[in-house]
A protein has these predicted regions:
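Short, acidic, metal-binding catalytic loop of nucleotide-sugar glycosyltransferases
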Residues: 39-48
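Active-site nucleotide-sugar/metal-binding loop of Leloir-type enzymes
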Residues: 85-100
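Catalytic-site signature of metal-activated, phosphate-bearing donor transferases
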Residues: 110-300
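A conserved acidic beta->alpha catalytic loop
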Residues: 53-66
Length: 300
């Protein structure tokens, strides 16, 4: 199959199942992180993955084509966002879709107890079409050169820390109508006064409809009803291969230790809620309690 600049590689059937939660990714030489990312999102409850690969030569394609729940497309263009939008509009309509980078792990309030399909069912119930997230850079409490990751192991076992503060929110006129700044990258770029802070807000979880488009990465999208709850993307760029991902934009080297006064070790979603980095609401909390109670066997 050829669609725009995407050519289908695998020949697996794609079932017509509207209940599937589908993830969409772009890959290029991502074998170091790929299995860890796929495992995390499978455990959340993602049913099927659609991947646009930009010509990987490090074994990424072999891993993708060997996975029975992954559909692989060769991307021949330079615009990864256009490829994602093409895939989403071909295979996403009617589904809850999760669009992430291979270096990102999606988390949301109560993700430890509430599987992603049930969380999406809750969002449907309250009339939401999407959920926004903050991107949190994860790093080790040791020099960057020591953050050697073993493929397939949990990424948090290699990089378990993030900046707990400061983060700032500003309003904008593009959906989701706000942007978040701060965190580690702002710290590395000279602080909030330097004017170099990258945008950390994303809209990765969307109930896709025909004609929707991501506009500037996954940070902006054509207008949708954004949920009053918020999640996070744990971002694992700062492994020992950091130069391939962010070495050009940041003044860091193998001896740099990113651990600082604002660093905390990731624990769970409750911690992120307490820090004000993600958000829950009472109706979601009550839904989780009911779901948990229904699973608990009654004593005789």
């Amino acid at each position: 199959m050829t669609d725009g600049e995407l050519t289908r590689i695998d020949g697996r059937p794609i079932p017509d199942n509207r209940h599937e939660v589908r993830a969409f990714l772009v890959t290029f030489n991502d074998s170091l992180r790929l299995q860890s990312a796929l495992t995390h999102h499978r455990q959340l409850g993602v049913d099927r993955f659609f991947v646009a690969d930009g010509g990987s030569t490090d074994g990424t394609l072999d891993q993708l084509t060997a996975a029975p729940d992954v559909h692989v497309f060769a991307a021949t263009g330079d615009d990864g966002l256009a490829g994602l939008n093409t895939l989403l509009n071909a295979y996403g309509p009617g589904h809850w879709t999760l669009t992430v980078d291979v270096s990102e792990l999606f988390v949301y309030p109560h993700y430890e107890e509430l599987e992603l399909p049930l969380f999406c069912r809750y969002l449907n119930h309250v009339g939401s079409q999407a959920m926004a997230c903050v991107s949190l850079d994860m790093y080790a409490a040791s020099p960057l050169g020591d953050a050697v990751h073993r493929p397939g192991t949990p990424l948090r076992s290699t990089c378990g820390y993030f900046d707990s503060a400061p983060y700032q929110l500003s309003r904008t006129d593009m959906c989701p109508y706000f942007e978040i700044y701060g965190g580690l990258r702002e710290r590395l770029m000279g602080g909030p006064g330097a004017g170099l802070s990258p945008v950390l807000s994303r809209v990765p979880l969307v109930r896709w409809q025909h004609g929707m488009q991501y506009l500037r990465g996954t940070g902006n999208i054509t207008p949708v009803i954004v949920a009053n709850v918020m999640g996070a993307l744990l971002r694992f760029d700062f492994l020992s291969d950091f130069r391939d991902r962010c070495g050009a934009e940041l003044a860091i080297d193998e001896s740099t230790n990113l651990y600082g006064a604002a660093s905390v070790k990731f624990e769970n979603s409750a911690q992120l809620i307490q820090l004000g980095l993600i958000k829950t609401v009472r109706s979601l909390d009550e839904s989780v309690k009911l779901t948990t109670a229904a699973r608990t066997p009654k004593s005789a």
